[in-house]
Amino acid sequence: MNNARPIRRALLSVSDKTGILEFAQALHAQGVELLSTGGTARLLADNGVPVIEVSDYTGHPEIMDGRVKTLHPKVHGGILARRGIDEIVMEQNNIKPIDLVAVNLYPFAATVAQEGCTLADAIENIDIGGPTMVRSTAKNHKDTTIIVNAKDYGRVIAEMQSNEASTTLETRFDLAIAAFEHTAAYDGMIANYFGTKVPAHSNDECHEDSKFPRTYNTQLVKKQDLRYGENSHQTAAFYVDTNLDEASVATAVQLQGKALSYNNIADTDSALECVKEFDEPACVIVKHANPCGVAIGENLLEAYNRAFQTDPTSAFGGIIAFNGELDAATASAIVERQFVEVIIAPKVSQAARDVIAAKANVRLLECGEWAAKTTSLDYKRVNGGLLLQDRDQGMVGLDDVKVVSKRQPTAEEMKDLMFCWKVAKFVKSNAIVYAKNSMTIGVGAGQMSRVYSAKVAGIKAADEGLEVQNSVMASDAFFPFRDGIDAAAEAGISCIIQPGGSIRDEEIIAAADEHGMAMVFTGMRHFRH
């Protein structure tokens, strides 16, 4: 094979020692001479693997507390040398070819994530020699093999064993791409860190100036190509942030069903993030990124039955999310009752999987349990730019709200208000949600005027024969006029939760009092666009 390049000499220098001993042993078994540095060299030597210290190879010791180890012509000349072109120069300078380099970099991200990390700590974990070797080897991938991820050790050894201790150009090119991606992400993390800091009087300290750096660097990895985008004439792919490990649609495992579409992924994200808001067994049904039915119950089956009852028409072809293990009874209720695109839960029992298997096209996802909410950022793409903000994780409890009406909400009303407020956060603005007994009974989403969202919620409830009388209403933002209050009262709403903050708040409160309603202010808005 004319593009195969034999591996006769390798340089191994890794911070993450996972699998490196076994890799080195396999290379040695193939007759490869091994060069190494520091802790990696000690690990190999202690386990009987013949290894040459890089400082012995170059004839130059490590200096400056290890800051300078591999930055030497005998190292980089051996890596960058073009086979068939540079042999005379190599011979004149006593440089031997280095055919494979396995490097992973100082753990900068893990270091700066630690509480109490100083600027000095961060600086000492900026790798210099490692990225230089990675880039050199990747640049010369025509002749040299680079490995930056332990998962590729086995791949390279297998190819060498079947290919006379050589690697193919296809493999080297693929590994070079991974290497450039690796160094780009690494430098991006460093730039992001320093871009949010300003120096203090001490060289060892710095202060956070902003969570938004001057340039924002992130790396997303393609998880899958999609059949098409939001519409069939658009092409699309799904990219994920591999630095985040929270339960999400990005990290979920698909257990069965057709390939996820662009819209499936977007809607599943909306459903899952909404159901995470609840501690009790809960079900969220989403259609076109809006919850069309949300409920909590004694168990998931009851929660699903009640969520479906809100709007069976819209639930057809919807996305269903749960916050507990999906059981067979709930799975049976779903497949017997409706057409569903996606079901997602933190865990799916084997019995539930067996039930859903009868519907081969249903996409079944398992996302794992979730813990505390993350501090990651939210993105919105605009033409020519990107909007970044904190994720909307604002919460209010019973102690945070203020009753502004003459009538106090009852305990049951207050419970429903808290439930309704959580749902409204995930409905497109202008958002109005009607709820009763911890179940949505009408959702008005995305109307350009708030009063029309209130009317839509009432129409939805009436269409499904749901009793609005003495139910509660949540509004994601303040009411600019009293017409929304009047519409709610006409529908039978007894209690309202809203942020407050309108210049007409007094008029709005007076309208609530006029109708005998209770009204609660949260002081927090939940626009969703």
UniProtKB/Swiss-Prot annotation:
This is Bifunctional purine biosynthesis protein PurH. Residues 1-148 form the MGS-like domain. GO terms for cellular component: cytosol. It comes from the Bacteria. The IMP cyclohydrolase activity resides in the N-terminal region. The lineage of its organism: Bacteria, Pseudomonadati, Pseudomonadota, Gammaproteobacteria, Alteromonadales. GO terms for molecular function: IMP cyclohydrolase activity; phosphoribosylaminoimidazolecarboxamide formyltransferase activity. Belongs to the PurH family. Pathway: Purine metabolism; IMP biosynthesis via de novo pathway; 5-formamido-1-(5-phospho-D-ribosyl)imidazole-4-carboxamide from 5-amino-1-(5-phospho-D-ribosyl)imidazole-4-carboxamide (10-formyl THF route): step 1/1; Purine metabolism; IMP biosynthesis via de novo pathway; IMP from 5-formamido-1-(5-phospho-D-ribosyl)imidazole-4-carboxamide: step 1/1. Its EC number is 2.1.2.3, 3.5.4.10. The keyword Cell membrane does not apply. Keywords: Hydrolase, Multifunctional enzyme, Purine biosynthesis, Transferase. PANTHER family: BIFUNCTIONAL PURINE BIOSYNTHESIS PROTEIN ATIC, BIFUNCTIONAL PURINE BIOSYNTHESIS PROTEIN PURH.
